[in-house]
Amino acid sequence: MKATRKITYTAVLLALLIVLQWATKSLGQFVTGSCVNCVLAVAALVVGWQGGLTVAVVSPFVAFLLSIGPKNIAVVPAIAVGNAVLVLVLWLLLNRRFSVLRAVLGVVCAAGAKFLILYLLVVQVLCRVLTLPEKQAAMFGTMFSWPQLVTALIGT
């Protein structure tokens, strides 16, 4: 794929991801998260790891700036890292020969890796390091645990 086309596809996927986050914000984490992960998977498989990483890392920051993402800036880099891990694992496992086994393995590994990264970074590190109100820490503990695995599995 030519560089101009890759850049265009990356920009369109980033815009699509932002619009989907805005449009599904009121529908809850399972719908929004699944949509986000779906766009990330498409980005990884269509434009490759570079474009996928761009969408994965830039989108949480743009969502925060537009007030459609998390309200706490401290979790935004963790989300970017989780998204990046999902993209990289999918790309590494699926960019070569395609098979059903490889696809299932790629989805499960990518979803599991994203869940693990977000759980460790947000729940185990940020919630302990930051002085968060108890209610917000509990909310992060719920949001960034098993629902991340479910939305990653659904979306990818």
What positions do the PLM features span?
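Loop-helix junctions at membrane interfaces
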Residues: 1-156
